[in-house]
Amino acid sequence: VYTLDGTTPTPSSTVYTVPISVSGNTIIRIATVLPTGKMSKIRTVEVEKQAYAPAVKVEAPKQGLKIKRIKGNFLKVNQLELADGTWEYTDIDSLKDIKIKQIDDAATLRGANNYAAIAEGYINIPEDGVYYLSSRFEQVWIDNKLVINNEGDVKASTTNDSSVALAKGLHPIKIVFLSNIVGGWPSWWSKTSIEMRKDSEQQFTEVDDSQYYKQ
């Protein structure tokens, strides 16, 4: 069942039988009703009507991303603003390299080797369209807009998928990875990738490393 006016769904709300059609900004609230009448947790989906965000011109872009890392146990992104450690800067050719390769020994699983990493650069969008995004990173920003926010969540799965309208070409991207343990799940056990699909597609596919650029 679902509602389109922001109210909480009840067992007597509209039953989902066909794709939901909306014409403007809408808050969709969805729940599953069991045969017993018991309802699941409510999921909220914010639908925003957007024009295609324009691409940017970048002089002589090179494949890869710029990255900075800092040691420490961070549970919130804003804690990085007050971090008193030293940032280390480098470039990476693959988004998978945002994560430090380390052994899951006792010290690591106690959080002794935790750190934060921020990768920045550009993502190449192959054609105009509305794109759905999914990721287990702490945060993903595109065009300086927060499009994925998993802050504080257990990274074993993600329910914070988002969509954005993007024009063909390069768009600024920032990816935040916090190496920490939330709810007993080390974040480094999760995939360090971003998956996308156009609104006309059914399956998510991982963004290829060839789509990431730096200046």
Task: Locate predicted features.
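Beta-strand signatures of extracellular beta-sandwich domains
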Residues: 1-3, 134, 139-141, 193-195
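Short beta-strand-plus-loop segments that form exposed binding edges in beta-rich domains
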Residues: 174-185
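Aromatic-lined ligand-binding clefts that engage carbohydrates, nucleic acids, or primary amines
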Residues: 123-139, 173
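Extracellular Ig-like/FN3 beta-sandwich strand-entry sites
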Residues: 23-27, 128-130, 168-170
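Short, compositionally stereotyped local motifs that mark structural "simplifiers"
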Residues: 1-69, 87-91, 98-99, 104-111, ...
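Extracellular carbohydrate recognition and processing domains
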Residues: 151-161, 169
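Beta-strand acidic-aromatic groove motif in beta-rich domains, primarily in extracellular
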Residues: 183-194
